[in-house]
Amino acid sequence: MKKLFAVLLALAMLLGLMSFSVADEIDADLIAAAKEEGELVVYGSCEEEYLQAACDKFEQLYGIKVTHQRLSTGEVQAKIEEENGNPSADVWFGGTTDPYNICAKEGLLENYEAVNAAHLLGPAYRDKDGAWYGIYKGILGFMVNKEELERMGLETPQDWADLLKPEYKGLIWLSNYNTAGTAKLVINTMIQKYGHDEGIKYLVDLDKNIQVYTKSGSGPSKNVGTGECIIGIGFLHDGIYQIVDNGYDNIGLVIPSSGTSFEIGATAIFKGAKHMNAAKLWIEYALSPDCVNQADEFGSYQFLVLDNAEQPAQAAEFGLDPENVMDYDFEDAKENTTKYVGEVMEALGAAADDRFKTE
């Protein structure tokens, strides 16, 4: 018994030291300077519940007052571009990296070499210059209302090409290319999958079956369970949220059979942030279990990209494999997303109708 007690005590001490060492990596001077500033303003592109929890935990840990606003990644991009180096917020939290890359290219993000970036699972999960850092990974796919498809006598689409079938006309929802990072990822995915011209042609053909373009990337998922949307294109963790948290067990999740891409959900500091030290401390916090391990508790079921974080059990339960994805070219996306969005909208021509209104 004494030996067992000694082993347990030693293990507890070791775990305590490990926990301390992770927290202790953050420079004490940075913490002091951040507390001196006393404030932080966050634009969040993750879901509101997780955003609120992340901000509350930061306040609790450091005593720094946090103000936040939930916006889609496209809305944040537009706002930061308009403010042009004089941002009204300090940091960006959550949302796919394609809009982050555009802002980085435009010089609107602050490069910062984060200490806790050492815990990232690989170099793909950060900008090479430190403009942004990944905190999670989400798989792009389809969410379908199984009951409505059965009622209509329709098969569940299994691949991207299936979405072009005439029987799905008016049944598909996708987010707006102008406002949602998810939709920008769809553009890049199709261009990388099919080639430039064929990828744009695919999106023009897909448009014929699109009923609604939502402002936010999670918009389609929120309407599948009710039957208003029959087939939604988006991130599958948003579908898991609707099943687990909202009880919509009529939703089916589909990973396209010929391959799909993924988002890296990120965090970054805005160039010209008024609370720069608090912003840097936020990045360290966002790259720690203190922040990301609470994600699934608040309805965010993405795969985490830190080696010291606990993966959400819900993602594995639905059979999602975080490695079953195409080799996404982030550099091409960084250089060309804005151009590609313009080319798609131009190719749509008159089809770019009221469904794309952002007001």
What label would you give each PLM region?
Residues 54-62:
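A short alpha-helix/helix-coil micro-patch that ends at or immediately precedes a cysteine
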Residues 98-102, 230-250:
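A ligand-binding cleft/hinge motif common to bilobed small-molecule-binding domains
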Residues 138, 202-207, 213-214, 247-271:
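Periplasmic-binding protein-like
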Residues 260-328:
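Mature extracytoplasmic/periplasmic domains
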